[in-house]
């Protein structure tokens, strides 16, 4: 059995004296592990870092075996990502989210969103907006997608500013006003189709977005598995909070 595919390194662990087991999120083969001979060597260390993109060739005698990888770098992001605290936390959190997906189950949209997010970590606000969208995409892939297209009460597609914490559906301003204290806020960048790039956010939008996705991830995905939010998620949000508090450069 063998295949070749694009992949992003999620994690690496040493195996024996010189090998490493590498976990990738691939475009067409999902989250997939394989052994890299010599992967524990100093020569391989710069390549085998979370966030780097590779061309992976996998080979095994049987499909269910761990198999062996040969990896070729296509984009080396790790050195840049290690230069900022929000990126370090963000990459770790993204990997923890990807691990919620079944192993070897293709999720091409998740792969594409991961690439988009990793490539925009130089701007902390844009990266945060992408990460919130990534969490929404994980919810959808696992069967718990939110319906943010129209008001659950009226069917209106305008002034959608709330989300029901029970149904995960959008609620318009007029329909939600009497229960505003019980509803979650829907950030502007999640209700504006033109904001897919991640631009157009405010600090409050980001906090509202993490509150929104965090509520549904915890209730629908993590708690049923006996898990909680990753420490890296909290670290990322704290790093974003500090960045927002810094004085703007003149």
From Swiss-Prot:
It holds the Pfam family RecO_N. InterPro entries: ARFGAP/RecO, DNA_rep/recomb_RecO_N, NA-bd_OB-fold, RecO, RecO_C. Disulfide bonds: none annotated. Keywords: DNA damage, DNA recombination, DNA repair. It comes from the Bacteria. GO terms for cellular component: bacterial nucleoid. Involved in DNA repair and RecF pathway recombination. This is DNA repair protein RecO. It comes from Rhodopseudomonas palustris (strain ATCC BAA-98 / CGA009).
């Amino acid at each position: 059995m063998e295949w070749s595919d694009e992949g992003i390194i999620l994690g690496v662990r040493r195996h024996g004296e010189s090998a490493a087991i590498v976990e990738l999120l691939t475009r067409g083969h999902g989250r997939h592990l394989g052994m890299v001979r010599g992967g524990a060597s100093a020569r391989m260390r710069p390549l085998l870092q979370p966030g780097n993109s590779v061309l992976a060739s996998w080979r095994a005698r049987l499909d269910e075996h761990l198999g062996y990888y040969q990896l070729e770098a296509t984009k080396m992001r790790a050195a840049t990502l290690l230069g900022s605290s929000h990126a370090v936390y963000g990459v770790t959190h993204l990997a923890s989210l990807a691990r919620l997906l079944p192993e070897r189950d293709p999720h091409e949209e998740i792969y594409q969103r991961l690439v988009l997010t990793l490539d925009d970590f130089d701007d902390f606000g844009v990266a945060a907006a992408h990460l919130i969208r990534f969490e929404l995409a994980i919810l959808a892939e696992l069967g718990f997608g939110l319906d943010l297209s129209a008001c659950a009460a009226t069917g209106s597609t305008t002034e959608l500013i709330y989300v029901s914490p029970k149904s995960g559906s959008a609620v318009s301003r007029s329909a939600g006003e009497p229960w505003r204290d019980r509803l979650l806020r829907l950030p502007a960048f999640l209700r504006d189709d033109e904001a897919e790039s991640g631009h157009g956010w405010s600090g409050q939008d980001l906090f509202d977005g993490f509150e929104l996705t965090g509520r549904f991830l915890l209730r629908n995905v993590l708690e049923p598995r006996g898990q909680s939010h990753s420490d890296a998620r909290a670290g990322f949000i704290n790093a974003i909070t500090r960045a927002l508090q810094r004085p703007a450069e003149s």
